[in-house]
Every structure is written in structure tokens, then in C-alpha cells.
Amino acid sequence: EGCCSNPPCRHTHPEVC
């Protein structure tokens, strides 16, 4: 859920995960 489960967002904001 959130940025971590959205591949494009996760790639853009890896620090979130």
C-alpha cells in the first residue's frame, strides 16, 4: 500500500522503502 507498492513511485522514491 502507498508508494512502496507502486512500482513507478517506488523507483522514484526508493528511500520510502
Swiss-Prot record:
Disulfide bonds join 3-9, 4-17. Expressed by the venom duct. Pfam families: Toxin_8. The modification Cysteine amide is found at residue 17. It comes from the Eukaryota. One of its GO terms (cellular component) is extracellular region. GO terms for molecular function: acetylcholine receptor inhibitor activity; ion channel regulator activity; toxin activity. PROSITE patterns: ALPHA_CONOTOXIN (PS60014). Keywords: Acetylcholine receptor inhibiting toxin, Amidation, Disulfide bond, Hydroxylation, Ion channel impairing toxin, Neurotoxin, Postsynaptic neurotoxin, Secreted, Toxin. Residues 5-7 are annotated as: Ser-Xaa-Pro motif, crucial for potent interaction with nAChR. InterPro entries: Conotoxin_a-typ, Conotoxin_a-typ_CS. Alpha-conotoxins act on postsynaptic membranes, they bind to the nicotinic acetylcholine receptors (nAChR) and thus inhibit them. The cysteine framework is I (CC-C-C). Alpha4/7 pattern. Belongs to the conotoxin A superfamily. This is Alpha-conotoxin In1878. It comes from Conus inscriptus. The lineage of its organism: Eukaryota, Metazoa, Spiralia, Lophotrochozoa, Mollusca.
